[in-house]
Amino acid sequence: MLLLTVVLLVGVTLAADHPTLYAPKGGSIELGVGAKQKGQYKFEWRFGNLKIVIAEMSSTNQLEIKFPDNGFQNRSEFNPTKHNLTIHNASYEDSGTYSLHQEENDGTEHTDNFKVIVQGMSLYTYLQYALISPI
């Protein structure tokens, strides 16, 4: 019975949706799941179907990181320790769904989805303006 359970888990895709994130125009968008998980050898950050970062363990057990030439490469950072993605100088066009696809050695895949909305100003700035502006 245990063998059957293990066989059924191979190749399973798990997905998780995170709360919507709001970022100010011109600011930074920070996306991540927090901690590095063991057993994973391939990571892809995507914006829709566009790959932003591809990180994969090499045969020498080194993490190889690639930034495809697609407009994000000069303003994005990948944290190889926690697998987080930071996008700088956010624009309205950066609003949408970002996904972190992680693949483990046994073929199991995990996907974390993040919806991002880029706004004209931060909520903090808006509240400051609203509180000091005359009616």
Curated annotation (Swiss-Prot):
It comes from the Viruses. InterPro entries: Ig-like_dom_sf (IPR036179), Ig-like_fold (IPR013783), Ig_sub (IPR003599), Ig_V-set (IPR013106). SMART domains: IG. It holds the Pfam family V-set. SUPFAM superfamilies: Immunoglobulin (SSF48726). Disulfide bonds: none annotated. Coiled coil: none annotated. Gene3D superfamilies: Immunoglobulins. This is Uncharacterized protein ORF11.
